[in-house]
């Protein structure tokens, strides 16, 4: 791996973040679902500070990114970090940057006293699953199912009090 450095996103990086989000969405076959805008990223990442972004850079050029936020484990009684997005540009894959990004995020979790680092992976994404289980030695949480409310169902639930 060539001189990989990490840089936290700052205001002005919104277009770069959005570009990574779009490229990840294309890889995940979900590009039609991206509605994020630079303005929304400014609001939620930089103004409200609800998520953080770290870029992996080589010679000052971004090659990958992570977007993450804190969650909380009632069982552990402490915060954890939830990795929402991890993406390495196709031309830079297989060079250790994904592992470096995850290791960097693990370091952040340990420094902040977090009890765990977790994320989700699409069940068809065998290259990522193999990477997580073999290279990172992550444990799949097969007994859990993710549930989600969005759009009209979220509004209906909010109004059904």
Language-model-detected regions and their locations in the chain:
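A short beta-loop-alpha structural element at the N-terminal edge
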Residues: 5-19
């Amino acid at each position: 791996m060539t001189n990989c450095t990490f840089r936290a996103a700052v205001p002005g990086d919104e277009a770069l973040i959005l570009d990574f989000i779009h490229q990840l969405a294309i890889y995940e076959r979900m590009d039609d679902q991206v509605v994020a805008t630079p303005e929304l990223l400014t609001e939620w990442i930089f103004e409200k500070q609800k998520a953080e972004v770290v870029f992996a850079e080589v010679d000052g050029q971004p090659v990958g990114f992570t977007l993450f936020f804190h969650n909380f484990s009632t069982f552990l009684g402490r915060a954890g970090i939830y990795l929402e997005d991890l993406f390495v540009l196709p031309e830079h894959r297989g060079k250790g940057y994904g592992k470096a990004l995850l290791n960097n995020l693990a370091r952040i979790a340990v420094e902040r006293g977090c009890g765990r680092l977790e994320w989700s992976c699409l069940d068809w994404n065998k290259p990522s699953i193999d990477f997580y289980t073999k290279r990172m030695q992550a444990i799949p949480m097969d007994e859990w199912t993710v549930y989600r409310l969005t759009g009209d169902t979220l509004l209906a639930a909010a109004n059904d009090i």
